[in-house]
Amino acid sequence: MSVAGLITEEQLDRAMRLVGRGRALLGIVGQPGSGKSTLSAALLAALDERGVRTALVGMDGFHIAHRALTELGLVEIKGAPSTFDVAGYVALLRRLRDPAEELVWAPEFRREIEDAIQSAVPVRADVQLVITEGNYLLVDGPWRPIRDLLDEVWYADVPEDLRRQRLAARHEFYGRTPEQAWERTLGSDERNARTVAATRGLADLVVTL
C-alpha cells in the first residue's frame, strides 16, 4: 500500500473541502508516538495526487534550543509545553494564514541533532493547504490562539501500548539504552501524553491509525 493509501476517501474529501476558500491551515494533533507524522505524510501524498499544492510545517520547529534548555535546567523535560517558543509558532501561523507574502520560511526540527534548523521549509504564495502537526495544538493558555488560526484540527489516535512501544523504539534509535528509552517514555513523555489526551474531545475529527 502506498503512503497515500493510508487515507480514506472520506478523510481526503474532507481535506479537499478546505481547499478553494483561500489558503487553508489544517492541524494534525496527537500524543507523542501517535503517528502524527505518518498521517501528515499520507495526507500530503493523497492531496498531491489530486493536484493540491501543500506544505508541511511542524510545531517541533519551535523547540527552544537544546543548549538553552540545558542552561535553564529544562532539558530533562524537553517536549513539555514549557519547552517551546509558543509565541514564535503563533506568529508563523499568522503569517501563513495570509498568503500575501511571496515566500515564508519555517523552521524544521531535526532529531539527529536534537535541535531546529531555521528557515528550512519554504512555503510559497501558491500553496493552497498548509498542514501543521504537533502535540499541543488544542491546549489552552498561551497555546489557545493556535486553534483560532486553524480551519480544522484532526486528532491522530492509536492504542496506548502501541504508542508507547513506538516511542521507546524511537528513543533507542536515537541513542538511548532500552532502560533509558522506557524511563523517558513512561516519565516526561507520559505526562505530556496525558496533557494531549485531555484535548481529544476538542478535535474536529479523530483519525484512528
Where are these regions (language model features)?
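ATP-dependent NMP and nucleoside kinases share a basic, alpha-helical "lid"
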Residues: 113-170
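The Walker A (P-loop) glycine that initiates the GxxxxGKT/S ATP-binding motif of P-loop NTPases
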Residues: 30
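Walker A (P-loop) phosphate-binding loop of P-loop NTPases
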Residues: 33
